[in-house]
């Protein structure tokens, strides 16, 4: 009697994923158009002009790829750590206690987005895994770090005895062979250097599904799988790929992401067209967001040029830098007299006068009245 096939990897054709090239064409064309806009804008600004934007994008990627896993990181610590890696001014901002785990995650993201020419190897994957779990523990549980899992893996939800199995990964026996097949395919299909180059955005979609289906590590597969997404995107787009934050887009529709992933992994055939279509839509939306934030970066550059021609006190310069470093909508609650007082180490009356003057100079916009007064940079789209 033929055994019951539950997961896509149980099909005899696995891992030969296929898709309908004609059906995906409209979504692929839309994604490529959004991608082209980003490439054009990035070229206009130049790499130096993009540095701050790359910092903000990597910050978003780190925060959201962790949020998908239910882990909340401190935004200021993440931003400061990334700024240090990029050689940007951090004004001595420290990494706060309890946030040391962000360093490993940033190592992974930076390696994936910066070293796009390096082949993806088992050693590189294991190094990423080791960086994510430097203590050898995931929470209270000891795991095999920097090595493929040696135990069965299930994705479940619900209470013990009433749990639902969303997915069961391939057995650890033969897993090394399966991972090797994935890595060989990934490197051979590199759109620029591969012996069998493949359309970059479709390749990114397939690579994420394939890796998540293997689920080769005890923990951290989601974060590593999304790092592979960013690597594939960078190999397709070059440096501009560093500013498209797919984890932010996935986090915004997390439930649908897991639903689409589960549907693809339960497929009764190797046809994963629906998954590729869904991923192309997410890439389009992530690219459109990146395009808007590049526009914001251009506005910021122009704003800083205006600000450079205005005589500001050291106190005002400190506070304006704080606001600009936080990025669009990044300074939660806006600037208040009390916050400026603490930043500039000055008196309340002086702090109030400073902010009023910045508003009069056209550098800040005021929201609210009285105790509810908040100030934001006078850049379109920067206020909350």
Give each language-model segment a name.
Residues 1-384:
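FIC/Doc superfamily catalytic core
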């Amino acid at each position: 009697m033929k055994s019951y096939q539950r997961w896509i990897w149980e099909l005899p054709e696995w891992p030969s994923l296929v898709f309908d090239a004609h059906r995906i064409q409209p979504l692929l064309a839309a994604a490529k158009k959004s991608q082209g806009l980003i490439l054009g804008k990035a070229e206009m600004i130049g790499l130096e002009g993009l540095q701050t934007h790359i910092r903000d994008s990597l910050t978003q990627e780190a925060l959201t790829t962790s949020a998908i896993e239910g882990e909340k990181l401190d935004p200021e610590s993440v931003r400061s750590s990334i700024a240090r890696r990029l050689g940007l001014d951090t004004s001595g901002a420290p990494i706060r206690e309890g946030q040391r785990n962000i360093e490993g995650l940033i190592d992974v993201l930076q390696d994936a987005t910066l070293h796009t020419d390096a082949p993806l190897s088992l050693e590189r994957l294991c190094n990423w895994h080791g960086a994510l779990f430097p203590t050898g523990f995931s929470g209270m549980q000891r795991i095999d770090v920097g090595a493929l899992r040696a135990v069965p893996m299930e994705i479940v939800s619900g209470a013990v005895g009433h749990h639902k199995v969303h997915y069961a990964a391939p057995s650890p026996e033969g897993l090394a062979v399966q991972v090797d097949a994935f890595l060989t395919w990934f490197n051979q299909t590199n759109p620029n250097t591969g012996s069998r180059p493949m359309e970059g955005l479709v390749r990114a979609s397939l690579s994420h599904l394939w890796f998540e289906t293997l689920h080769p590590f005890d923990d951290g597969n989601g974060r590593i799988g999304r790092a592979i997404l960013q690597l594939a995107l960078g190999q397709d787009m070059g440096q501009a790929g560093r500013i498209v934050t797919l984890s932010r887009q996935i986090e915004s529709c997390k439930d649908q992401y897991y639903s689409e992933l589960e549907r693809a992994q339960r497929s009764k055939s190797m046809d994963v067209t629906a998954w590729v279509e869904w991923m192309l839509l997410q890439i389009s939306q992530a690219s459109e967001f990146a395009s808007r934030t590049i526009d914001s970066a251009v506005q910021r550059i122009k704003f800083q040029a205006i600000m450079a021609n205005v005589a500001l006190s050291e106190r005002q310069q400190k506070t304006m830098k704080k606001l600009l470093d936080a990025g669009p909508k990044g300074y939660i609650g806006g600037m208040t007299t009390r916050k400026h007082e603490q930043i500039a180490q000055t008196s309340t009356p002086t702090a109030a006068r400073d902010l009023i003057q910045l508003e009069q100079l056209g550098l800040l916009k005021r929201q609210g009245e009285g105790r509810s007064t908040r100030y934001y940079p006078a850049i379109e789209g920067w206020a909350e």
